[in-house]
Amino acid sequence: MIGRTREQKQGGELSVEDIQDPFLVSIHIIADPGESKCLQEAIDRLLVWIHPDLQLFCVSERRVLKKKKPSKSFASHPALAIILFLQEDYGEEQILHLHKCFQKPPWQFHHTERVHGKFLPYMPCNQDFFTLANGTPLWAIRQVHYGKEIIRFTIYCSYENFADMMKMYELIIKKRVWRKKTDFCVFPVYSNMDFDIEFSLKRLVKGQKPVPLESSLLEFRVRDFGQLIPLLPNQCSPISEGRWKTEDHDGNKILLQQAQCLARKTAWKHQNYASRTAAMTQPLSIAPRSRKLKYGKHKARASHGQVQHFGGSQTDFPMGQVDTFRSLKFPSEAAQAFQRSKSLYCLPTMSTFPSCHSFPMSEPHPCFGLDTYETPAWRISPKINIDDLEGVEETDVDTGMKLSSSDLSVVSAYSPLNGPCSDLEASLPSEGALAQSDTVPGRQNHSSDSLHSVSDISSSPCPVFPSTPAQSQKHILSHYHQLSEITSHLSETLNIEEEEFYI
């Protein structure tokens, strides 16, 4: 844990609830002795396709080999799954590549489910689930045809406890449900221009029981322990300073880590960090060439309103920061991986707020033309800043004992405090320009009038447009009917595509 070694900076503090935290939800995976490195590398090879700095999983080793219990009955279902939604625009290459990765050790096939919507190219009617080892979460990849890429944590709930668990996790995450059905709901965790992190609950059918995972624990960063603990259904027990252990209604073990208030940086601190930015080596995101070629198309889709930004305003990627990244040269060296310790890790809290240049992912540099790539492209992504961590101490998940070695593989990287940059405001058209654009003949008079519905036009005994000939009115009515049919068709299409995310 991190002690508050610095004095409070002037300028106030920012609550954890007011900012987006990509590490709000993370997972501990406890492997048998000698297997942690293999399992960690297998997970990293998957997440690098979305972003390499998202160290949301940490695999550690237990001290003694645990005896394997006999498999549960067919009516049981592992309680935790991780689903990666990958963009179709990047091509089928990545889907096929990742599916081949699942065919190799340490991955093991678990089961297949029927899914809705458009399906994966290699399995036209089914969705395959895989696992790394006994007692670890299920994994699946899903191809999506619109929106952004998604990392989703899913808890499978018993039929009886679904409603209660939804209320419980809403208290812990402190975010409202974004999508909700009778047997499914999604909580937004983090969102930026490239990908989303989500937490979801899915209710199993009657008679099917979720099996809590013995080798995996979910960890949530919470703020007000005093208010939260009395509201939880089961007893909470402290395992270290600022960390508590409890269970949900289905018996899933979860860890709660206190996220303290984050002090704002002084202006001098920001200037000092900005002066060092150009000299820092930026880590690189591995991305195949197909992802690079489709990147512009994906951005265009998002800009046309097909992606709903949730979890707060999209101020985590100010335009000024984009300009900073564009001014940097392409690094000649690959990023070095964070050094991991073999102990069970702890997400550190922070005594000071990281710089505004900490986490948001940058867009591709404009000078990197597509025709210059002969090998798989690299996409620039700013390094998560760990320079400001002080006094990091690691604690064992089971014993709560403090450990001497520190593990900085997972750090809290918060979004910038600043709102939309002035550069963005300057690039937008002024009100005067918009007013001039509305002075086009034949447009100004209709701008303030509300459009009549098709039913109103059809049932109106007098002409809706008195100055329009009868033949022209028939043409207008026909045009409205066509628009109504198109709108209805688009609505049905969106409902079908929504099924892609129902898994």
Swiss-Prot record:
Polar residues composition bias: residue spans: 436-445
InterPro entries: FAM124, FAM124_dom
Start and end residues of each stretch annotated as Disordered: 434-470
Compositionally biased residues, Low complexity: 447-460
Cystine pairings recorded for this chain: none
Signal peptide start and end residues: none
PANTHER family cross-referenced by the UniProt entry: FAM124 DOMAIN-CONTAINING PROTEIN-RELATED (PTHR14715), PROTEIN FAM124A (PTHR14715:SF4)
Entry similarity comment: Belongs to the FAM124 family.
Protein's recorded name: Protein FAM124A
Organism for this UniProt entry: Xenopus tropicalis (Western clawed frog)
